[in-house]
């Protein structure tokens, strides 16, 4: 019951947080569905324009519209209003990805968290630590983003809030050596999850690749029994830039999932559709606020429902 209540509460926040995106997309749709008396090429072009403006991305949009055209033709649909549910289902289909498991919840794990400055990376690490701690896990944080002076202090505050141990080093210290120390601590203290806050200097890809390679090597050598998850943090307010960043990180790291932050108050929430559709990398968590519990597991169907403000009456039926 508590789970259902929490989920309902989060869905409500998601609906509120996506207000700008919804105004951007849905208001346009409604005027098209009510403003057109027949389905023609102009009708499709208008829909396409709204999807692209909502940051759903050109490729995903083309696929959604093509599928809609096929269905309209097959089902001999004449009334534009009948396209709305088909469109919602089409967006959900575009967001299907191969794997959305949270394998790190069920075994000894290391989670590497990467992302450029300013996306809310360190905050996300802190919130994720709190989330896993609430699940009864022993969590250790590693402050391996030594490039940004304030990152360590910020992470220390989050570790304090979440009630978890933190392994850090001096500003400018070698991130790989901090990860090495953190692995030793994780093993000695029998931690379930070690979360490493690592730098993400995309403008210097060569250095970033080297740094990540070193970290991966240490983890393989020192902690081969741990499952490794790499999460990229992206700022939802940056729209297509976030997609470009995700692509670049996927080139240098084995990315298992995305944390999409700052979705409250952005008109670019459609980027979640573009990421899953184009990269086949699941968005695993989304942030819609500043509180420690404002990082929640991502549910693509609930997200699209919130985008269209579809009533989630049966929200409490699943975990």
Model-inferred region functions:
Residues 92-95, 100-319:
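P-loop/Walker A NTP-binding module and the surrounding RecA-like catalytic core of P-loop NTPases
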